């Protein structure tokens, strides 16, 4: 059985400067791993290499045995890998509900059409409501995401990442700025 994620001799350079040197890593399906290191150690860059936001200078990235290095992020996501970002990445002008619904729609393969009321899709509505409850933002459902506290935005981004339906998830500092109780809820959702 192939690993969920595998990096083989991955390197990333910017000009003459080597940022990532010879990373080899294998993570089995269902395992949880953490990349730990000081600021500037290359943790986020490694996530960018895995998720397609950067291409490796050399080496290969595999998702369940299939080469994904060099693919654009949306194709990697369609193959079952989702990620959150170190800097919160939500649709600031959309409501909490709309942010989550977009991720759920993406995961179900539904496409938005202006003539189709997506709120009439029970599968999408129910899954969105469940994730909203899981991240403890039901009371903030109709609030514009840009008006949420930083911790609430982090929770929303975790919800979006999970809602995408991927079976491999990369979380970049997912609980930064959260209280102890918020962190416990986030960890429970991630498990």
What annotation goes with each model-predicted range?
Residues 2-191:
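Glycine-rich phosphate-binding loops of nucleotide-dependent enzymes
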């Amino acid at each position: 059985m192939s690993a969920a994620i595998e990096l083989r001799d991955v390197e990333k350079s910017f000009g003459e400067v080597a940022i990532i040197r010879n990373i080899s890593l294998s993570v089995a399906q269902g395992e949880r791993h953490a990349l730990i290191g000081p600021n500037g150690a290359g943790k986020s860059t490694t996530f960018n290499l895995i998720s397609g936001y950067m291409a490796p200078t050399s080496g290969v990235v595999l998702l369940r045995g299939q080469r994904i290095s060099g693919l654009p992020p949306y194709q990697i996501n369609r193959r079952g890998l989702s990620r959150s970002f170190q800097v919160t990445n939500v649709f600031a002008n959309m409501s909490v509900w709309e942010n989550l619904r977009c991720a759920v729609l993406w995961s179900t393969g539904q496409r938005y059409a202006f003539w189709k009321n997506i709120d009439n899709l029970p599968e999408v509505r129910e899954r969105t409501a469940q994730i909203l409850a899981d991240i403890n933002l039901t009371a903030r459902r109709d609030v514009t995401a840009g008006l949420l506290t930083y911790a609430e935005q982090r929770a929303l981004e975790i919800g979006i990442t999970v809602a995408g339906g991927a079976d491999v998830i990369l979380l970049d500092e997912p609980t930064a700025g959260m209280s102890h109780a918020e962190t416990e809820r986030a960890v429970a959702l991630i498990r």
